[in-house]
């Protein structure tokens, strides 16, 4: 928390040339670079009302965050061109670029009436073309691709015998 808030930074592997990329009040995290290294996708909760700001700062003072409402953002790797990708409400998180760098896959509970049902979705880099990928009644999240783009891995609470255990699933990816 160099700036007093949870921001995104880049730096060289030796710790030199630290650059702050984000500066708006709120929790910025879960960042991943695009395959070509030119863009970064991340999740963020951005408090706007006085009550939200007070709650955020109170939690932050205790080293905590309560990011129940998170949206996805994309920014150029040099810190320019910040754009909000999703406007879905609830929790949109665990973003990851598809291997071709043209879409983002992420987890969201925006369609869940009670909030605990998370599924995977894809979206274009301009925020259009939202498409649901998984249709589970529990929790699917943390999607990532194999280096060749032929497999997707993700965590899920499906097929766990009614426990809260989360397991890793690997599936063929068909675009």
Predicted regions and their residues:
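Residue-level detector of Asp-centered blade-edge/turn motifs that repeat once per structural unit
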Residues: 35-36, 99-100, 147-148
């Amino acid at each position: 928390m160099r700036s007093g808030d949870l921001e995104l930074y880049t730096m060289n592997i030796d710790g030199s040339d630290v650059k702050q990329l984000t500066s708006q009040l709120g929790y910025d995290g879960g960042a991943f670079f695009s395959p070509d290294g030119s863009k970064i996708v991340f999740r963020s909760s951005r408090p706007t009302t006085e009550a939200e700001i007070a709650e955020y700062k109170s939690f932050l003072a205790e080293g905590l965050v309560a990011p129940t409402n998170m949206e996805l953002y994309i920014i150029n790797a040099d810190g320019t061109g910040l754009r909000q990708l999703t406007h879905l409400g609830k929790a949109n998180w665990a973003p990851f670029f598809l291997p071709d760098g043209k879409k983002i896959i992420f987890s969201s509970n925006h369609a869940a009436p009670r909030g605990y049902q998370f599924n995977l979705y894809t979206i274009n880099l301009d925020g259009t073309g939202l498409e649901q990928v998984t249709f589970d009644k529990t929790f699917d999240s943390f999607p990532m691709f194999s280096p060749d783009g032929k497999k997707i891995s993700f965590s899920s609470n499906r097929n766990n015998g009614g426990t809260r255990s989360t397991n890793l699933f690997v599936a063929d990816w068909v675009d």
